[in-house]
């Protein structure tokens, strides 16, 4: 199994984020943010099957990953971020997804 230091991969990591993390939301995404003990900011992406078929869900995942890649240099280090995609996020363009996540990151005080 590949080791991804900048990804949340274990079920227990997600459960900790849901239980202890602070929750922020908008029309397209819900994010859970919590501090971790590592020097990197890690990303986890989830969504319900209600969002749509695998093609739609994977497109939203790609949008979130790309937006996170662009914003990562501005984010505080040592945080776990879980992004939950909502059904309306399937119609987003890349710039819209990035703007939405940037607003949420600002509200969560992740942007330095």
Report each predicted region and the residues it spans:
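Positively charged, solvent-exposed patches that mediate nucleic-acid binding
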Residues: 1-112
């Amino acid at each position: 199994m590949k080791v991804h230091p900048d990804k949340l991969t274990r079920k227990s990591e997600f459960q900790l984020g849901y239980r202890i993390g602070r929750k922020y939301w908008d029309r397209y995404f819900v994010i859970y943010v919590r501090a971790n003990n590592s020097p990197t900011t890690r990303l986890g992406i989830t969504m319900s099957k209600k969002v749509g078929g695998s093609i739609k869900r994977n497109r939203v995942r790609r949008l979130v990953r790309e937006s996170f890649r662009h914003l990562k240099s501005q984010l505080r280090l040592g945080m776990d971020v879980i992004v939950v995609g909502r059904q309306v996020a399937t119609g987003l363009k890349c710039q819209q997804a990035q703007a939405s996540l940037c607003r949420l990151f600002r509200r969560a005080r992740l942007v330095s």
